[in-house]
């Protein structure tokens, strides 16, 4: 094959291969203010300390005059061209605090799985990536600063991290054997640590419709790293019924358009169409759009996430409906087979927040009542089993003694209630009737208030 043929073949491979890059952002440079506990670089007369038990490689770019330096047990200071470290004289910078040493922050704080620490060099304005795709995907080329110092924690995910290649310290690793040897060397151990594993050699994405990122299993650890500064909790969405796109850690306000496609669909061309025909319109200026291929129910689809970055205005829903109409009108040209739309609810207002808090309070009250009832039942059961509390059936109760009177003694009258009366003779009959012989057993009592009158009449 001639030179021209090789050039044409290389151009064809470049066209077929849609290489994506992820750039590592943080560093362990001596001249980066965020690497020091006072958020400033050392000034003249400062005493500086490095963590004694941490391995770290630190690049020094400028010249510094310091009064004292405590170095780590295992590490290195790399002096760039023109850089120098010298002992400070008697004078110190008035802006410095000579009483407190300047401490180099923990270099192990940077995790591979933290989306904050990566940047995509191919991200156009108005576009963003869901959280799982902000970390290097399996088809990505990973770039670390060529002329900078860094340290990365691998893990703690369950599976090795797979990428296409890793470029670090002036070398590009695309074979596992070469990368493994580098990670085992002192130079590699100064820059990579942790329980996780890193693998290279994955294939680049050659599918015009896009490729699945491959970080679905790592998403819980990605979200843990992302939300660590927030205490592990997502901020509350500013709308009712928010949406959770696939690959995202927290709910969003906006809309999601799901597209099924045929082999003629081109992901990059569809992204460009969104930017040129829709996002440039004034009513959609405040929207952010993420377009990627995701795996759902063993099938792939194109997920278009529309997020309102400012106050909810309904623009995301409007754009979602516009994309549905565009899919109907131009679906055969774009390679779109079907499209569905999901939208979040209305913006959160004071009344809706009050209703949510009231319903939450009611639910909490109901749960608390159930817990109290369960505790009360448990206490009663324990008391019963210990013999301190007894209960009987109604039929097991002792019968009332038959000899006890059914009435009660009245202290005011202090008289016997039932008293035998003499026989009386009815005027219309010669028959005597004994009152005690009547079935009803009537009785009478002597009222002391009228006892005198009764005796007088007698």
UniProtKB/Swiss-Prot annotation:
One of its GO terms (cellular component) is apical plasma membrane. It is found in: Apical cell membrane; Cell membrane; Endosome membrane; Membrane, Coated pit. It comes from the Eukaryota. It holds the Pfam family Amnionless. Interacts (via extracellular region) with CUBN/cubilin. This gives rise to a huge complex containing one AMN chain and three CUBN chains. It comes from Mus musculus. Residues 1-19 form the signal peptide. The complex formed by AMN and CUBN is composed of a 400 Angstrom long stem and a globular crown region. The stem region is probably formed by AMN and the CUBN N-terminal region, including the EGF-like domains. The crown is probably formed by the CUBN CUB domains. Disulfide bonds join 43-96, 137-213, 205-211, 223-249, 234-250, 239-253. This is Protein amnionless. Residues 203-254 form the VWFC domain. One of its GO terms (molecular function) is cargo receptor activity. The gene is Amn. Membrane-bound component of the endocytic receptor formed by AMN and CUBN. Required for normal CUBN glycosylation and trafficking to the cell surface. The complex formed by AMN and CUBN is required for efficient absorption of vitamin B12. Required for normal CUBN-mediated protein transport in the kidney. InterPro entries: AMN (IPR026112). Residues 384-458 are cytoplasmic. Its main location: membrane. N-glycosylated. GO terms for biological process: cobalamin metabolic process; cobalamin transport; Golgi to plasma membrane protein transport; protein localization; receptor-mediated endocytosis; renal protein absorption. PANTHER family: AMNIONLESS, PROTEIN AMNIONLESS. The role of Amn in embryonic development seems to be species specific. In mice, null mutations lead to embryonic lethality. Human mutations give rise to much milder symptoms.
